[in-house]
Amino acid sequence: PMPSVNIQLFGEDENGIGEIVARGPNVMMGYLNQPEETAEVLKDGWFYTGDLGRFDAHGNLYITGRKKNVIVMKNGKNIFPEEIEEKISRLPYAAECLVFAREKHNDLVLWTKIVYPEDYLKEKNWTVDQLAEQVRMDLGAINDAMPKYKHINHFILSHEPMIKTTTQKIKRIPEIEKINAQQDSELWYNCTM
């Protein structure tokens, strides 16, 4: 951190991940004319950022996600969707991706929606089913590198852009609501055959 700025983690879990809090002369004093919102994020001189992170052995801070995006599985394990999305976004056909949970047989299972560029299929001379097979293999490799509770079980393919803010960030809640309102589609797949 900068001189005279303190950064700590609040409410750390067993993996050392907690909410990033900061205080110092250059940290915000509050929201203008919004005392309730200010009281939610400023406590005892600390600014609660809403970001989650962890420190490594050298004191470097790593941001792992947003507190409001955490998925709490039925077994109590926390999943930070941004961690998995970062891996999926490296795939050459993943223009956009979103990880979310849906209820299935009294449990939560992870899904991802992947938006692929429309011309990707033309460039590869593939059908959507051929892309789905590639996605299934790639998600299998991603799953193999993660604990079982973080495994993606299902995926959705689309070439339609997701709902975004003016700064081009995916609006998670409206996009998930849109997905949940849709009936199963031929473009919804299981990760295993």
Place the predicted regions along the sequence by residue.
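Short coil-to-beta-strand transition motifs
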Residues: P1-S4, F47
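Glycine-centered tight turns that cap/initiate beta-strands
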Residues: S4, Y93-E96, H151
